[in-house]
Structures are given as structure tokens and as C-alpha cells.
């Protein structure tokens, strides 16, 4: 699906996020999906006239596994450089255990390096489209979006979704994450965008209306922060069910009780002992339709492509990654 003649929207299916292909003499791929979906990513690129070996640069909107999971394979197979906000670049390249929130979220990410740290106001020229880097914190501190003024297109990442809002993580992204998300929305709403591409959901045909809806929801969460906690927990747990192919009845409780995100939201977000939160979260997953029991397993009900067993080929936690080799910028 095209966003404009020079920016192609590559729709992702969970566990992958959407991607964008920005065409030109030096084509750019924005985000790379989940690691197990790399063959599909390569196929989408070829179908859109840009085989992966022709890419000049990968740009990550932020470092969660559904947006950076294909980095490792694309770097190893094609030697492609990666660009990301300088704060997240430093964490990735230093193999910081907090990088990608991989351990906190229990989400695997294979090793990659960031070759080009980005800052607010940087410009990327594909030879056909100029992309302006916007620092858009909220979902993560180092989140960026890309503005193509000549196209009137915003590439949002998870700053705003086509059919939802991004979950907020005050425990790893700071107590002011919600306020930063609101400031990001205010800033984005001032741009004359005619179309916006988000990390999840369909293209946004009325960006201003989407920003207004997201702002109202975040403002409500500021007044009722427990709603933000429930939203985040359902999103994170549903994603875990997707990437692990569901959980058996006797696996749900032990799994949740070993997850750092579950402990933080239970104790610090909702004032509950983690053991007290297992039942209510499971009940809400079932009530809301986020998950259901199928043949004795709790599975996510949103459309998704379960990763095949054995797809990981290397360490899946940044602290275990090998040191990055030298790469050209």
C-alpha cells in the first residue's frame, strides 16, 4: 500500500510492526519488524522494487523488538548501516542490559549495532525524499518520528497508532513519560501532515483527528493512571502470548511472576502484590477479547504469525551480545 509515490507503507502483522520504504537513489527502510519475520520483510522489499541489498540505510523509530528485530539479519546479510536516536544508539552499542527493554519485557532481540546516531533536526536525503528527524519521546525516551514535508507524510513509529495509542512505561522511560507523550502530540499536530504512517494499524488519513483522539486518551490516563497500567499490561502480555505461541494453563502464573514488567505494574502501578494480580489480569485478558483458551493454551486472539521454533540464531539479550564490530557510518 502506498503512502505517496515515493513512500511505501509496508504493513506488518504481529509480532512485527509496520515499516516504511522511502524510495530514491539512496533508499531508506524505516523499522525492520520482528526477527522471525525477516523473510517476509525481504519479500516485501523486493515486491516494492527495492531488494534489501539496494538499501542505503535502516532507520529505527525506537528500539523495541517489533521495530528492530530484523536489524541483525539485514546487517549480517547485506552490511546495511542502522540509524537511531543517539540515546538509544549509545545503549545498544554499549550492550546495556536495559537496551531495547528486552529483559524487562522478556522480548528477544538479536545483536545489531547503530552506525549513525541521530538528533532532533537531522535530515536524511534519499535522493528522492528528504526526511527530517523529530525527537518524539513518550513511548520511549529516544523515540523519533520522520517528517517528509514535500510529501506531507509523517512516519510516526509508536508516537501515535492508527487504531490505538502506544502503551506508556513510566518504570523504564521515566515518571514523566505520559507528559512527554502529550507534548509530542501537541508538536506533531502543528505539522501540515496530510497522511501519517504509524507503527501499528492502518495509515492515518486524518492525522489531526488521530492526534486529538490520542491526546484525550492520555489526558484521561493522567487523571486515572491505573487505566494506563491496565492498557500496558494487556498489550505486553498479549504480545508475549504471540511470540511464545501461547501458554498452558499451568504456565501462565509462573510466566507472569518471573516478568519484571509484571512486578513493576502490579506493585508500583496498581499497589498489588504480584501474586494478587495474576487472576485479575487473566480475567481482563479474557473479558476484553485480548486472549482466549484454545486446546488448553492461552493464546492471543489478534491476528499474528507465531514465530517458528528455533528461529533465534544468537543471544537474545543485549548484555549477552558480542561487542559491535567497526562499521562505516
Task: Indicate where each model-derived feature is located.
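Short Pro/Gly-enriched beta-strand edge/turn motifs at strand-loop
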Residues: 1-7, 102-106, 127-129
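Conserved beta-strand hairpin/beta-sheet module of binuclear metal-dependent hydrolase folds
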Residues: 1-48, 52, 145-157, 162
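A structural signal for the main folded, soluble domain(s) of proteins
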Residues: 5, 55-56, 69, 74, ...
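Divalent metal-coordination and catalytic microenvironments
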Residues: 22, 31, 41, 62, ...
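Active-site HxH/HxHxD metal-binding segment of metal-dependent hydrolases
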Residues: 34-39, 46-126
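Metallo-beta-lactamase
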Residues: 34-36, 123, 130-137, 141-226
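Soluble or luminal CAZymes and related metallo-dependent hydrolases
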Residues: 37, 116, 176-180, 273, ...
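C-terminal regulatory/interaction regions
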Residues: 229-329
Amino acid at each position: 500500500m502506498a503512502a505517496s509515490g515515493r513512500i511505501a507503507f509496508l504493513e506488518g502483522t504481529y509480532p512485527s510492526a509496520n515499516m516504511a520504504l522511502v524510495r530514491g537513489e539512496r533508499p531508506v527502510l524505516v523499522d525492520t519488524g520482528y526477527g522471525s519475520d525477516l523473510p517476509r520483510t525481504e519479500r516485501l522489499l523486493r515486491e516494492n522494487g527495492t531488494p534489501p541489498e539496494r538499501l542505503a540505510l535502516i532507520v529505527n523509530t525506537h528500539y523495541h523488538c517489533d521495530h528492530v528485530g530484523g536489524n541483525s539479519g539485514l546487517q549480517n546479510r547485506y552490511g546495511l548501516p542502522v540509524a537511531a536516536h543517539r540515546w538509544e544508539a549509545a545503549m545498544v552499542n554499549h550492550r546495556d542490559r536495559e537496551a531495547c527493554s528486552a529483559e524487562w519485557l522478556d522480548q528477544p532481540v538479536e545483536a545489531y549495532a547503530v552506525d549513525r546516531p541521530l538528533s532532533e533536526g537531522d535530515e536524511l536525503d534519499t535522493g528522492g525524499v528528504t526526511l527530517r528527524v523529530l525527537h518524539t519521546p513518550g513511548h520511549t525516551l529516544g523515540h523519533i518520528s520522520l517528517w517528509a514535508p514535500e510529501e506531507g507524510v509523517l512516519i510516526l513509529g509508536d508516537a501515535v497508532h492508527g487504531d490505538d495509542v502506544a502503551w506508556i512505561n513510566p518504570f523504564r522511560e521515566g515518571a514523566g513519560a505520559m507528559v512527554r507523550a502529550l507534548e509530542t502530540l501537541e508538536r506533531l499536530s502543528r505539522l501540515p501532515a496530510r497522511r501519517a504512517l504509524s507503527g501499528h494499524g492502518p495509515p492515518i488519513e486524518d492525522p489531526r483527528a488521530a492526534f486529538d483522539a490520542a491526546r484525550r486518551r492520555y489526558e484521561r490516563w493522567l487523571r486515572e493512571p491505573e487505566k494506563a497500567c491496565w492498557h500496558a499490561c494487556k498489550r505486553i502480555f498479549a504480545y508475549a502470548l504471540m511470540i511464545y505461541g501461547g501458554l498452558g494453563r499451568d504456565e501462565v502464573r509462573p510466566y507472569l511472576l518471573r516478568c519484571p514488567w509484571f512486578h513493576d505494574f502490579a506493585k508500583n502501578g496498581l499497589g498489588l502484590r504480584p501474586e494478587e494480580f495474576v487472576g485479575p489480569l487473566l480475567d481482563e485478558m479474557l473479558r476484553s477479547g485480548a486472549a482466549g483458551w484454545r486446546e488448553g493454551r492461552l493464546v492471543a486472539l489478534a491476528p499474528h504469525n507465531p514465530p517458528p521454533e528455533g528461529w533465534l540464531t544468537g543471544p537474545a539479550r543485549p548484555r549477552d551480545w558480542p561487542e559491535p564490530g567497526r562499521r562505516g557510518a
